[in-house]
């Protein structure tokens, strides 16, 4: 289950996470990863056929006609380049929707003027609403597999804000 840590080191309670998420239109849910995917998701990298198998095992979301699977792992040659790009603070014209299937990451958000880190792992489903400034960082393990749901490709383009990472 997702946890929220503030810059001062304090961890938000479940009630605080719910209140903060509601106030900022962030969706944080837990949707279990199908057990049938365990063997496929255990692989460090996935080819197109394996990625399609993963996507086919998850129900489509009609409101988000496009989806793909992002796989970041130390064995991926461009892993650090991609990870660094996501670490820059940005916003999108459309919602950013992720269903974490394997690994872990951290969505940084600004809550009431204070930076907060939403730690996500397998089964966490998060929607960062359009226009909300955020970033994404890998944990020390440097790996994650997540479905990205898109309403359209244009709304997904990042507008970098210049805030220091």
Swiss-Prot record:
Sorted alphabetically, which CDD domains does this protein's record hold? cupin_ARD
Provide one Gene Ontology biological process annotation: L-methionine salvage from methylthioadenosine
Annotated catalysed reactions: 1,2-dihydroxy-5-(methylsulfanyl)pent-1-en-3-one + O2 = 3-(methylsulfanyl)propanoate + CO + formate + 2 H(+); 1,2-dihydroxy-5-(methylsulfanyl)pent-1-en-3-one + O2 = 4-methylsulfanyl-2-oxobutanoate + formate + 2 H(+)
What SUPFAM superfamilies does its record include? Answer: RmlC-like cupins (SSF51182)
Q: Which Gene3D superfamilies match?
A: Jelly Rolls
Site Important to generate the dianion: list residues. 98
EC number(s) from the headed UniProt entry: 1.13.11.54, 1.13.11.53
Keyword Metal-binding listed? The answer is yes
Keywords for this protein: Amino-acid biosynthesis, Dioxygenase, Iron, Metal-binding, Methionine biosynthesis, Nickel, Oxidoreductase
What GO annotations for molecular function exist for this entry? Answer: acireductone dioxygenase (Ni2+-requiring) activity; acireductone dioxygenase [iron(II)-requiring] activity; iron ion binding; nickel cation binding
Q: Which residues bind Ni(2+)?
A: 90, 92, 96, 134
Cofactor(s) listed: Fe(2+); Ni(2+)
Cofactor binding description: Binds 1 Fe(2+) cation per monomer. Binds 1 nickel ion per monomer.
Q: What InterPro entries does UniProt report for this protein, alphabetically? A: ARD (IPR004313), ARD_bac (IPR023956), RmlC-like_jellyroll (IPR014710), RmlC_Cupin_sf (IPR011051)
Pfam family for this entry, one: ARD
Q: Kindly list any coiled-coil regions of this protein.
A: none
Q: State the top-level EC class.
A: oxidoreductase
Detail which positions bind Fe(2+).
Answer: 90, 92, 96, 134
For the site May play a role in transmitting local conformational changes, which positions are given? 95
Pathway(s) the chain acts in: Amino-acid biosynthesis; L-methionine biosynthesis via salvage pathway; L-methionine from S-methyl-5-thio-alpha-D-ribose 1-phosphate: step 5/6
Superkingdom field: Bacteria
Entry keyword Ribosomal protein: no
Family, per the entry?
Answer: Belongs to the acireductone dioxygenase (ARD) family.
Q: How does it assemble?
A: Monomer.
The task this protein performs is described as: Catalyzes 2 different reactions between oxygen and the acireductone 1,2-dihydroxy-3-keto-5-methylthiopentene (DHK-MTPene) depending upon the metal bound in the active site. Fe-containing acireductone dioxygenase (Fe-ARD) produces formate and 2-keto-4-methylthiobutyrate (KMTB), the alpha-ketoacid precursor of methionine in the methionine recycle pathway. Ni-containing acireductone dioxygenase (Ni-ARD) produces methylthiopropionate, carbon monoxide and formate, and does not lie on the methionine recycle pathway.
Q: What is this protein called?
A: Acireductone dioxygenase
- UniProt organism field: Rhodopseudomonas palustris (strain ATCC BAA-98 / CGA009)
Gene name for this UniProt entry: mtnD
């Amino acid at each position: 289950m997702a946890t929220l840590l503030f810059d001062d080191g304090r961890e938000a309670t479940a009630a605080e996470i719910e209140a903060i998420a509601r106030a900022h239109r962030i969706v944080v849910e837990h949707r279990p990863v199908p057990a049938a995917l365990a063997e496929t998701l255990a692989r460090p990298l996935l080819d197109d056929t394996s990625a399609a198998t993963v996507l086919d095992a998850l129900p489509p979301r009609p409101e988000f006609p496009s989806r793909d699977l992002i796989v970041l792992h130390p064995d991926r040659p461009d892993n650090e380049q991609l990870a660094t790009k996501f670490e820059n603070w940005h916003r999108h014209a459309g919602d950013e929707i992720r269903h974490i299937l394997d690994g872990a990451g951290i969505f940084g958000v600004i809550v009431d003027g204070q930076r907060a880190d939403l730690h996500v792992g397998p089964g966490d489903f998060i929607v960062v609403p359009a226009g909300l400034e955020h970033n994404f960082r890998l944990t020390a393990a440097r790996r994650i597999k997540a479905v990205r749901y898109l309403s359209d490709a244009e709304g997904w383009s990042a507008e970098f804000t210049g805030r220091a990472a």
